[in-house]
Amino acid sequence: GFISTVKNLATNVAGTVIDTIKCKVTGGC
């Protein structure tokens, strides 16, 4: 349903943001 799609999208975005932050913090870009 719509809610599940939104949740999945939010999870994907959050994961991408977290990965980017980890990359910058660890200098592993």
From Swiss-Prot:
A Pfam match: Antimicrobial_2
Keywords for the protein's UniProt record, in alphabetical order: Amphibian defense peptide, Antibiotic, Antimicrobial, Disulfide bond, Inflammatory response, Mast cell degranulation, Secreted
InterPro entries referenced in this protein's UniProt entry, alphabetically: Antimicrobial_frog_2
Cellular compartments annotated: Secreted
Disulfide bonds: 23-29
Main subcellular location of this protein, as a coarse class: secreted
Example of a GO biological process term: defense response to Gram-positive bacterium
Superkingdom field: Eukaryota
GO CC, any one term: extracellular region
Tagged with keyword tRNA-binding: no
Tissue specificity remark: Expressed by the skin glands.
Protein family: Belongs to the frog skin active peptide (FSAP) family. Ranatuerin subfamily.
General function of this protein: Mast cell degranulating peptide. Causes histamine release from rat peritoneal mast cells in vitro. Has antibacterial activity against the Gram-negative bacterium E.coli K12 and Gram-positive bacterium M.luteus NCT C2665.
The protein, known as: Ranatuerin-2SEa
Naturally occurring in which organism (per UniProt): Lithobates sevosus
